[in-house]
Curated annotation (Swiss-Prot):
It comes from Paracoccidioides lutzii (strain ATCC MYA-826 / Pb01) (Paracoccidioides brasiliensis). Component of the 90S pre-ribosome involved in the maturation of rRNAs. Required for early cleavages of the pre-RNAs in the 40S ribosomal subunit maturation pathway. Transmembrane segments: none annotated. The lineage of its organism: Eukaryota, Fungi, Dikarya, Ascomycota, Pezizomycotina. It holds the Pfam family RRP36. Residues 215-267 form a coiled coil. One of its GO terms (cellular component) is nucleolus. The gene is RRP36. Residues 15-83, 95-167, 311-344 are annotated as: Disordered. This is rRNA biogenesis protein RRP36.
């Protein structure tokens, strides 16, 4: 029978999936042919029924016989199909089901992707305005404005897109000569220590100790400059030359006094650190501590300020407090917005 032979062909195990598709298509076509034959038989039976109605009862027996024959033929075909299906192995059924499942999955995936592509809107680049075209006629894209810093302590924002300079350094300019004093140069002092690391690390301290007599020279020079300024200010006849000399002396006095003040501050910081280290060594030697405690820079500065304030006289304290008050007020004014500056 043709159906049984085709089903037996489908039962054979094949490696490639194209054979399964071919067999499935053939079986579908066979099923459609069977359906068409059944429809034709039903149509014929209907037609015969109509003829019997028209002709009378003489054709009724013939139509009944034809119906019985068609029913018996269809029952035989169904029994053949069921018997052939019972002979199919489970491996062939599993392979056929797997091939059909893969094809169905792939079709659903492609359909989903196509629907998503249809739904997703196409992003078109923003068209530049007329103002931007007038401002940047030759540029393809206008430069983006960088956002401002959150605070003055934040790092500066710089774009990574910047034009490379067209200039090229062919000959490097000579280095600017710097005046160096070998008495206070750290390189010279490190070489003169003969490889002693304890002395080499504290080269500046040893230099200050060796040339401590220069401080007395500076104080004498400062006193002479102040006397010279006082005599020029007391003179009645003042010309342009004297005024220029007075301004020069004032600048020199302020620079020398500031330099001496920094020397004193650094010396006081060294004394504070030396005293703290001495105390820590004694505490470790006595067994009160197992490890030393190192002061931070902020703690050292705070200790220096307290010492200087205790050593000042009454007038010096008032002057220092007034300077501090002005400094804090100017700092607050800088941080204040412009609208409040005008009101206050």
């Amino acid at each position: 029978m043709p159906i049984l032979s085709k089903l037996n062909k489908r039962v054979r195990a094949r490696v490639e999936e194209d054979d399964f598709e071919h067999f499935s298509l053939e079986s579908a076509s066979d099923g459609s042919e069977l359906g068409e034959e059944d429809e034709e038989e039903t149509d014929d039976s209907d037609g015969s029924g109509s003829d019997s109605d028209d002709g009378g009862g003489r054709d009724g027996d013939e139509s009944e016989n034809e119906d019985l024959e068609s029913d018996s033929a269809s029952s035989d075909a169904n029994s053949d199909i069921t018997s052939s299906l019972n002979n199919i192995s489970f491996g062939a059924l599993a392979k056929a089901q797997a091939s059909l499942g893969k094809r169905k999955r792939s079709t659903t995936l492609t359909a989903d992707i196509a629907s998503k592509r249809r739904k997703s809107p196409t992003r078109s680049p923003p068209a530049p305005s007329s103002k931007e075209d007038q401002k940047y006629p030759n540029a393809t894209r206008p430069p983006q404005k960088l956002s401002h810093r959150t605070s003055k302590h934040a790092p500066t924002i710089q774009s990574s897109r910047h034009a490379v300079t067209r200039k090229r350094t062919v000959i490097k300019p000579p280095a600017i000569p710097q005046a160096r004093d070998p008495r206070f140069d750290s390189v010279v002092l490190n070489h003169s220590t003969n490889g002693n690391p304890s002395i080499a690390t504290n080269a500046t301290i040893h230099a200050n100790k060796n040339y401590a007599f220069l401080n007395s020279y500076r104080t004498e020079e400062l006193s002479q400059l102040r006397k010279r300024l006082q005599t020029l200010q007391q003179e009645k006849s003042k010309d342009t030359h004297d005024e220029r000399e007075i301004e020069r002396l004032k600048r020199q006095i302020t620079s020398m006094s500031d330099r001496m003040r920094t020397f004193e501050r650094k010396e006081m910081e060294r004394e504070v650190l030396a005293g703290h280290r001495r105390k820590e060594r004694e505490a470790i030697r006595e067994g009160k501590k197992s490890q030393p405690w190192f002061l931070k820079k902020g703690d050292v500065k705070r200790e220096v300020v307290t010492r200087r304030f205790t050593e000042m006289s009454g007038k010096e304290k008032q002057r220092a407090l007034e300077r501090r008050r002005k400094k804090v007020a100017s700092k607050e004014k800088k941080e204040m917005p412009w609208a409040r500056r005008g009101v206050e």
